[in-house]
Amino acid sequence: MRNAILCAGLLLNLAACNGTDRTSPTAPPSPSPARAAVSGWVWDSAFRPIAGTRIEIVNGSDAGLSTIANSSGQFLLRGNFDAATQINATKEGYIGSSHALGALCASCALYFFLDLTTPPVNIAGDYTLTFAADSTCPDLPDVVRTRTYPATISPATRQNGSASPAFRMTFPGVRLLEGYDYFDIFVAGDYVVFSVDRDEGSALIEQMEPDSYFGIAGFASTSVGTALSNISIPLAGAFEYCKKRTSASLGCAPDATLRCESHSHRLVLKRR
């Protein structure tokens, strides 16, 4: 009897090896979302942090999980994330914004830009713009200590929830280098930021003489109320005077450059 049982077992094993066992293989389980952390920042359309913004997962296994942005607009949200995870940023008084994570990264960071529900102040028009150097910049020659230009502010094409500017300032008729002949203006409500900056360098470069140039870089901001007419505000940045160009790429030797950085330069704007 014992030999018969052993033989029967052997026959069953052989049958399985010969493919007579028709049991279908089971598909591997779908990977579950990865437990991770997503960090980021929330700003308004003038790059001010928005404290108290609610950051919430709106789909997937952790739908409803949320956190609150701190006083710097920064947040950290832990949960189960995959490429389809949708995260919303909302706060009263602002138009909410949403991000889909897409392909996960090793250290994901999200950037939300929320527009106020109230429209931004309209500052379009023709102006006279003056840059005045800080009095603590004794090395700058008088010719570049104060520079005045006719200027025009025009609306820029932007989308809600983006980091794009609301306006652009140009200088018709002024001898500025191509690509360094404008700067952008960001607006949130009645708060205005003049971004006189191009890749952390001068946004405006004026040709003074055939081989001498004046450049200015910096940021200035203020609240203008219901309209922009006349303002005089601090400009944090640098005035730079190149006494003699050393190459076709506008390189200026250190001994031919006069530069002054300060938080107390002035930007003066008067409507014409």
Place the predicted regions along the sequence by residue.
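Predominantly extracellular/secreted and cell-surface proteins with exposed
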Residues: 131-235, 239-244
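A short, amphipathic beta-strand motif
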Residues: 36-44, 73, 112, 127-129
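Short, acidic Ser/Thr/Gly-rich low-complexity loop/linker segments typical of extracellular
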Residues: 60-76
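Edge beta-strand at a domain terminus
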Residues: 232-272
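Extracellular beta-sheet/turn segments enriched in Thr/Pro/Gly and aliphatic residues
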Residues: 18-29, 102-121
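A short, solvent-exposed loop/turn motif at the edges and junctions
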Residues: 86-102
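Short, ordered, surface-exposed loop/turn motifs in non-cytosolic proteins
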Residues: 36-38, 44-60, 82, 139-143
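Short Pro-Gly-centered beta-turn/loop motif in secreted/extracellular proteins
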Residues: 74-84
